[in-house]
Structure formats: structure tokens, C-alpha cells
Amino acid sequence: QLKYKVEFANQASGSIPAYLPIVNIDTDMIIPKQFLKTIKRTGLGKNLFFEMRYDVNGNKISDFILNKDPYTSAKILIAGKNFGCGSSREHAPWALLDFGITCVISSSYADIFYNNCFKNGILPITISEDQIKQISDYSNRKEKISINLPDQKIVFGNNEIKFEIDEFKKKCLMEGLDDIALSLEKSDKIVSFEEKLKSTKPWIFND
């Protein structure tokens, strides 16, 4: 099961969100191609938004949002519209998660990136541009906001914004289920199907 289960099974304790108001951030901007050789999900966080976070000498750019306190430990990213466009590389959500980001808030996403987020334990919330402005204005005060997945709402100060989410995707996040865990939930049916297949089509199982 995925490591984010505990966090999303309860109301998130809260995080000061990092606001990155750039539209059309593609997956190559999230994690450049030179870091895609690995098939491990760990170790990519240090290269998240590499070309925006570091100069040509590899030094951190001090005024980039994720290089400034308190955003160096941000769990929530508020992003511009069409976030995650471009190629379908799954390394993009891997890099976000390895950095520590478990929730992205935007007005729109590329479809493949959006679905890859759920598969990797990141909650991508879609709300309107006006609502984005509300939250970003609040976040500029360096105040924490909370994500309440059970009740599907973003809580900031005395305000809250409701968001929509597919029930099945919500279940997977709440229960920490990835593709393997979902398959294991149906292990009895899988075994039963294989036994039936062995009796009706035994040649499939011949060495």
C-alpha cells in the first residue's frame, strides 16, 4: 500500500502552500529529461523544477518559491492552469511526491498527468480561477491551509472551498491503494478464475 494512506485518511494537519502562478507547466519543466533514466520513485525531489530552482552552475536560485522558507517543506502546491501538460512521463508525480508535495491545486490539468497523480498518491484538486485567487491571496500571508479529503474541502482560516473528486479515486487515496493493492483485493476472484481456466483451457498452462 502507498505511504500517504495515514495523511489522507484523516484531515491533513495543514501546510503553508507554495504558489507557482505559471500556466502550462509541462512535465519537462517539472522534471527534465536528463533525470528520467531511473526507474526508482525516490531521489527525484532534489531535481524538481530543476531549471527554475538552479542556475547554470547548479546553485539554488534564492527567489524561487521552493528554495525559500517556509516553502522548502511545502506539502501543497498551488499551480497555474494546464499543469502537467506535455509528455506522459510518470516521473513528474514521482518528483513532486519525493519532494514532499502530496496535493496540487489548479484550475486544470493534462489528463494523463492528472490520473498519474492519483496512481502515485498525490491529490490533484480542481477549482475555479477565482477560488485559486482566494487561496493564493491567503497563502501570501504564510498561513497554513488544510485539505479535508473525507469532506472534500479546502480549509483556510474561517473559509472553506468544496471540491469534486471521483468516488473510486477518493477511495484509493483514503485507503492507500495502488494498482497492486487493488489487484490483491480481488485475489480470491483471480484464483477462482485461474482454476476455472485450468479446467476449461488447460493448454494455456502447459510449459
Give residue spans per PLM region:
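Fe-S-dependent hydro-lyases/dehydratases of central metabolism
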Residues: Q1-D207
